[in-house]
Amino acid sequence: MGSTHYVADGFPDRIVATPAQDAATGFAVAWRTDASVNQPRLELVVAGNSPGVGTPRRIRASTATLASENGSSHHHRADVDGLHPDTLYAYRVPRTAYRVQGQGQGTWGAWNHFCTAATASTPLTLLYFGDTQNKNLSLVPRVI
């Protein structure tokens, strides 16, 4: 057995958003969970000025299973399209299985944000930094 520190569980981790081929109208989100999450969804809303988010659009994600020395994990990917250019969106992924037998809907993680690119004639700037390895929740938000 590998290090149990890196074992996947029902809480999503390794959440990564990437621009689509047309960064003005789409993006993709990938994340990892344990094998109990078998109907993953992503929720998406236009990020507004109000704490109320309205009714989110739900996007079904695809899932690939990876077997490793730490057991099986599910790697999910949701492709989002049909978005408006130069618009800030909020998205989130489920913390537990979307539907857990006998428990109804699962809970959702925190809202993350993604801004689509402007039109094709506008220069696009990206910020990239590598894997921080440690203190992701306490230090990374300070960079962003």
Briefly describe each language-model feature range:
Residues 1-128, 133:
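Acidic, histidine-bearing metal-coordination/catalytic regions of metal-dependent phosphoesterases
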Residues 109-113, 137-144:
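Alpha-helical scaffolding within the catalytic cores
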